[in-house]
Amino acid sequence: MASVSRRLLRRETIPCFSHTVRKLFSTVGSPSFAQRLRDLPKDFPSTNAKRDASLLIGKTPLVFLNKVTEGCEAYVAAKQEHFQPTCSIKDRPAIAMIADAEKKKLIIPGKTTLIEPTSGNMGISLAFMAAMKGYRIIMTMPSYTSLERRVTMRSFGAELVLTDPAKGMGGTVKKAYDLLDSTPDAFMCQQFANPANTQIHFDTTGPEIWEDTLGNVDIFVMGIGSGGTVSGVGRYLKSKNPNVKIYGVEPAESNILNGGKPGPHAITGNGVGFKPEILDMDVMESVLEVSSEDAIKMARELALKEGLMVGISSGANTVAAIRLAKMPENKGKLIVTIHASFGERYLSSVLFDELRKEAEEMKPVSVD
């Protein structure tokens, strides 16, 4: 073993091995060799390997939509946030809110219990972060959220509390606050009111869009859940070019931002039934309404025509973007929207009703 250590230390091509090897083979009051070996990748100085999965967040690709935009006056590109570690855009605010709370010493791994109301994707992202950092986490969520989301959160160790779907996200939020009051050492990230949610999109998502379009983006379209994405990206793009137009998207069946009433809809993650505190209405030209039916239809078309298997809110964003792209006044302009999550997360939802039934009824063929 000592000879191996000496050979590694002599390698001129990897001079920074010395610290790592000394740590690996040292016997001074340290853990077992096996434990040191397991810890080695975290400190290995000469690789491009990420220290942990949280460093995979961000830098998602921007892709033009081609077939679904036939006949449009403008170009439409969609940022593919399902390339994130947990396959949704919510990884960005999840890491930002936890990092912000840790920096302010509001939470401590192994001691604090995180509690958060969610429609699914934020819950998955927070559960992912909690698992890595060692937090207990409890999620409240409407019972209409898909089975895939529940199972995914549980796989990260999250505890789930389902709420009455008729009471929407308002009921889910109320239950979360009840748990916050009754749970010792509990903390809520408060995605609907936490400035870190907006700031991470100003710091990362917005600049990525600006860089990938070489500053040529004319219009940005985004569905409104917590409001963090449209507010943060909107502010950033307007700081670079005040002429960029920003549009929000909400379900037609729950159009409270346009003066309507909250109601049931299928665009999970959007249309929370109230105006979130962090939502910046002033950054937007207007909030476009998209029906659940149109959003579902478009999500299916994106898979069939573009090879992009995305969720229902991504379908809604695309419907709104195409609507703007068909306007003569937008001829030749570049419209950017976001595909917020991966479609596989919705296999048990209405999005795949027909295909799921077809798959369940398939019969095996005989093989000679």
Curated annotation (Swiss-Prot):
Molecular function in Gene Ontology: copper ion binding; cysteine synthase activity; L-3-cyanoalanine synthase activity
Residues annotated with N6-(pyridoxal phosphate)lysine modification: 90
Chief site of localization: mitochondrion
SUPFAM superfamilies: Tryptophan synthase beta subunit-like PLP-dependent enzymes (SSF53686)
Gene Ontology biological process terms, A to Z: cyanide catabolic process; cyanide metabolic process; cysteine biosynthetic process; cysteine biosynthetic process from serine; detoxification of nitrogen compound; immune response; root hair cell development
Any Pfam family the entry gives: PALP
EC annotation from Swiss-Prot or TrEMBL: 2.5.1.47, 4.4.1.9
Tissue and organ distribution: Mainly expressed in mature rosette leaves. Also detected in roots, young rosette leaves, stems, cauline leaves, and flowers.
Subcellular localization, as worded in the UniProt entry: Mitochondrion
The keyword Repressor is assigned to this record: no
Binding-site residues for pyridoxal 5'-phosphate, renumbered to this chain: 121, 225-229, 313
InterPro entries per record: Cys_synth (IPR005856), Cys_Synth/Cystath_Beta-Synth (IPR050214), CysK (IPR005859), P-phosphate_BS (IPR001216), TrpB-like_PALP (IPR001926), TrpB-like_PALP_sf (IPR036052)
Reactions that this protein is recorded to catalyse: O-acetyl-L-serine + hydrogen sulfide = L-cysteine + acetate; hydrogen cyanide + L-cysteine = 3-cyano-L-alanine + hydrogen sulfide + H(+)
Keywords: Amino-acid biosynthesis, Cysteine biosynthesis, Lyase, Mitochondrion, Pyridoxal phosphate, Transferase, Transit peptide
Residue range of the transit peptide in the UniProt record, numbered on this chain: 1-31
CDD domains, sorted: CBS_like
GO terms for cellular component: chloroplast; cytosol; mitochondrion
Disrupted gene: phenotype observed: Defective in root hair formation and accumulates cyanide in root tissues. No effects on growth.
Cofactor: pyridoxal 5'-phosphate
Signal sequence bounds: none
Record's function text: Acts as a major beta-cyanoalanine synthase. The cyanoalanine synthesis reaction is more efficient than the cysteine synthase activity. Probably unable to interact with SAT and to form the decameric Cys synthase complex (CSC) and is therefore not an enzymatically true OASTL protein. Probably involved in the detoxification of cyanide that arises from ethylene biosynthesis. Maintains a low level of cyanide for proper root hair development.
Family, per entry: Belongs to the cysteine synthase/cystathionine beta-synthase family.
Designated name of the protein: Bifunctional L-3-cyanoalanine synthase/cysteine synthase C1, mitochondrial
